Amino acid sequence: MSNKNKKSGGAGNGAAQKQTRQQSHDSQDYSSFKIVLFYCMLIVFLPVVTFFLLKGFVLDRFFSLSEVKVNIASAVGAVVSLHIALGLYIYRAYFGATGSKAVKED
């Protein structure tokens, strides 16, 4: 009987360790998901917002350009903002992940 108690007590600790390890992995996954979602939204919406801000508020009001030139300049601004957003994502993916190192598990 004493062997059964020892085995079940050890199994309880193992289950608790597995549960805390699973919670740790879940929180890491959620954190990674939030980061990727943020950069996806930045990559999708920043160029669109940049295009319309440049077109509607900056170029039309302050410069006397033709509509075609305003559209071209706004498109160039949107492409530049897209490249900045992609560069930020690549920088974060390459240099920002130093705190999360892979841990070998059995």
Swiss-Prot record:
One of its GO terms (cellular component) is endoplasmic reticulum membrane. Coiled coil: none annotated. One of its GO terms (biological process) is vacuolar proton-transporting V-type ATPase complex assembly. Residues 54-69 are lumenal. It is found in: Endoplasmic reticulum membrane; Endoplasmic reticulum-Golgi intermediate compartment membrane; Cytoplasmic vesicle, COPII-coated vesicle membrane. InterPro entries: Vma21 (IPR019013). Residues 1-26 are annotated as: Disordered. The keyword Membrane applies. It is a multi-pass membrane protein. Keywords: Cytoplasmic vesicle, Endoplasmic reticulum, Membrane, Transmembrane, Transmembrane helix. Residues 1-32, 91-106 are cytoplasmic. HAMAP family: VMA21. Belongs to the VMA21 family. This is Vacuolar ATPase assembly integral membrane protein VMA21 homolog. It comes from Drosophila ananassae (Fruit fly). The lineage of its organism: Eukaryota, Metazoa, Ecdysozoa, Arthropoda, Hexapoda.
